[in-house]
Amino acid sequence: MRICYKAGNVTYNTNYYSVITDSVEIRIWFLTDEIIRIRAGFDGDWDEASYSLAMTAWDSRTDEFLKGYRKRVEVAYSELVDGADKAVICGSKLRIEIEKNPFRICVYDKDGTLLHADITDLAYREDSNKRRIHTSQIEADDYFYGFGEKGGDINKAEKYMNMAPGDAMGYNPKETDSLYKHIPFYIKLSGSTHKAVGYFYHTTAECDFNMGREKRNYWHRYSSFRSDAGDIDLFLIAGPSIGEVISRYTDLTGKSILLPKAALGYLGSSMYYPELPKDCDDAILEFIDTTREEGIPVDGFQLSSGYCAVETEQGIKRCSFTWNHKRFKNPEEWFAKMKENGIVVSPNVKPGMLLVHPYLEDMKKKDMFVYDSIKDEPGKGTWWGGTGIFVDFTKEQTREYWKEYLKEGLIKYGCESVWNDNCEYDSMVDKDARVYFEGKGSTIGELKPVMSNIMCQLSNEAVTEYNENIRPFSVCRSGHAGIQRYAQVWAGDNLTCWDALKYNIATILGMGLSGVANHGCDVGGFYGESPEPELFVRWVQNGVFMPRFSIHSVNTDNTVTEPWMYSGMKDYIRTAIKLRYSMSPYLYSLEYRAHKTGLPIMQPMFMVFQNDSNTYNEGVDFMWGDSLLVANVVEKGAEIREVYLPDTGDKNIRFYDYYTRNEYEGGQTIKVPVDISSIPMFIKSGAIIPMAGNELNNLMNDNVDSLHIIMAPDIDSSFTIYDDDGKTNDYKNGSYLKTDISVKAGAKTYIDFEYEGSYENTAETMELDVIHREKAPFYVQLDGKEVPHFLHRRKYEESDIGWYYSQTKKSVQVKYPNPKKNHQVLISFEVFDMIGM
C-alpha cells in the first residue's frame, strides 16, 4: 500500500503548486476563483487526455478533438506562504491550508467556513489492489446529492454507491446500483451552514462512493471515493448556493446543448412497431395519424432497432446502418412523410457489430474495433443476437469512418436525429481489452464511459456536416460527465411499477444536479406487464414535466403502452399532454436557461429553498423552473395529497394553488384533495410563467399566436422568454427572440418588456394573468395610456384590448395587441376612496 503521512515543501511551478509527500506528488491548481483542482499522481504520469473537461488551463491530447467544446483559461491569481508546519495558498475567494505532519489539505471560503477537509492517514491512498482512495471529513448533518443517475432516495447520506454502468433492464428503482451513467460528481450541502460545495472526481474508471456508511473510532466521520484506476483527480467547486455549484460544474464539463423544440414534445415509441414482419413504415405513420385523431400532440418517434434487423446467415439480426426493406420499403420517402407530419425520427444505433454484420469485414479493414487484451484481433463479447465486437471511438480515423456510416446509412435518407443505445460496453467482460486512447493506449475498463459521449458528439457532427443548418438531436441511454454537451438522455429500461413512478423523479432530479438538464424516463414503464390504468395516468401526469417526455415500452404481456390504451382514461392523458404543450414557451425558455447556465429544468425543492432544511430530503415534489411547485400524485388510490410548502424566510413570498388561486403561507404542510384528474401545482410569489394562449399540437410547425403570462407580483422578479425557429442553427447568427420581463412590485406594479434578437415575434396577442387577491386595480396603463376596464367577462373576451378583474381567480386579466417592441404595463393598486370623492 501507499499512504501519504506527511509532506515537505510546497512550491509553485508554472501554473500549479507541487506538494511532495512521503508517498506521491500532489499538484494543486486554482483553475478559477471558485474551482480548485487537486491531483495525486500515483503513476507519475501527468499527461492530460480528458474527454470530460470543457474548461482547462493546460494542454491535453484531446484538445483538437474537443476544440469546438473546450475553453482554455488562465489559472486564477493566488499566493503561497510556505511554513515549516503548514503551507497556505490564498486565492481571491478560497484559502487552502496544507498541514504537513500529519498531512492533510483543508479548503475554506472567504468567510472562513470549512468547505473540505481531508482525513489524516486516509486521504490519499493506494491499496494492495492498486485502487486509489480519497477520504473526506463530513458531519452528521451533511446531505449529499447528485452522483449522476442513481435510484432510491435523493439524499445519499450513509449510502454506498457503485459507479460501473451497465444494461440494467427492469431495475429496482429503489435499490439497483449501478444504472446507465458514469458521472462521479456530487454536491455536499451542510445542514448547519446551508452552504454547498461540489466534488467532481475526474475519472472514467469504475469507482465507488461511501458517504458515511461506515464509521471508525480513530478518525472523524468521513466519506470516501475509491477508483479502480487512474489518479485521485478532484475538482472542488465552491458555492455557496447549489445553483452556483452546478453552474460552475457545467463551466467545467460543458453546458447543455440547445435541442430542437421537437425534443421537448411528446416522443412516441415502442419496440412493437419496428418488429412487425412487414410494413412497419405504414404502421408508424398510422400511429401518428391516430395521435392526431385522438387530439394528442406529438413531435417525435424514437425508432427502435427493428428497422435494421436484416437477413443474415444466422437468421434475422440487428445490424446498424442497414435497412429491412420489407419493414421499411423506401426509407427516404418514409422520412419525408414523417417530416411532412412534423415528426422528427430518431433511429436506434448501437456500437457493437455482430460477427454476421454485412459491413463487418469493411470495418475490420478500417481497424475500427477494440482489441482483445492478449490476441491481435478485435475483442469479443455477448451482443444482441450473438457474439459481437465493439467500436473504439478513441481513435480519430474510426470517428471519421463512423460519421460516414451514419451519413450513408441514415442521414442521406432524411434522418436528423440519432438514438445512441446500448453504449455502456457492458458485455465486454475482458476489461483489459485495448483501446487506442488518442495514441496513448489504455483499456476498455478505464474508458468505457466516454464511448457514449463520443458517439453523441459524432452523430451531431455527422448531421451538421451533411446539412450545416440542421440543429442536431442526439438521444443516449448511457453517458459520462459532459454528456449534456451533446444529448438528451433517459433513465434506461425502467420497470413498470408504482415505485418506478415515484423514485424515477429523484433519479431525474439527481441528474439535473449533476449537470444533465435534459433527462427523463420511459413514461408508463418500459419492462414488465402493461401499466394499470391509474398508474399510467399518474405517470403521464408526472411525465409531462420531465425535460424528455416519451412513452416507450416492451411489455411482457404482448401489449403496447399508448396514450389511448385505456378508453376510460385517455381524456386525462390528453389533458396532461396538452398542459405540457400549452406550457412549452416556459419549458423552451428553461431549456435555453440550461443551455446558458447549466441549471436544471426540474429543480429539487432544496435547490430553490436552500435555507429550509425541511426540504433537504424531498425527492418527489419539485420546482419547474423557479416559479411552479409540482406535487404530483404517486401513490395508488390517493384521495389526499400532503404538500409541504417551503419556508422562504420572506413574509411577502407565498404560494397559490394553480387552479383555485387559494393563497398559502410557506413553512406548512397542507392537505390537497385529489382525484384521478389531479395534477397539484402551486405558483410561487414572483412567478412569471409564459404559456401559449392558442392550442399547440406540434412544436415544430405550430406558432404561439397568443402569449398568456401568469404572474404573482408580490415581490420584484424577472424572467427571460426565449424563442427561435426551434430547428435550425440560425439562432447562432442572431435569429432568436429574447423577451426580458421585469416586474417591480408595489402599489404601482410596473411590468416591463424588453426585446432582443431578429427572430419574428409570432404572438399577435398578449394576455397577462396577474394574481392579486387583496383587491382589483384602480387602473391599468399600457405605455402611459389607460387600458379600457370591463366589468363583464364576455365583453372583455370580445375586446382586443382591456382589463378585467376575475373574482374567481382573484387576478387581473390584461389583454392587448402585442406591440412587438419594448413596452410597459402599469397596474395601479393604489388606495382609492370612492366614497370620499
Language-model segments: residues:
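Aromatic-residue hotspot detector
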Residues: 49-63, 323, 622, 675, ...
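Short alpha-helix boundary/capping motifs
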Residues: 366-367, 373-374, 684, 808-812
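Catalytic-domain carbohydrate-binding cleft regions of carbohydrate-active enzymes
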Residues: 1, 113-677
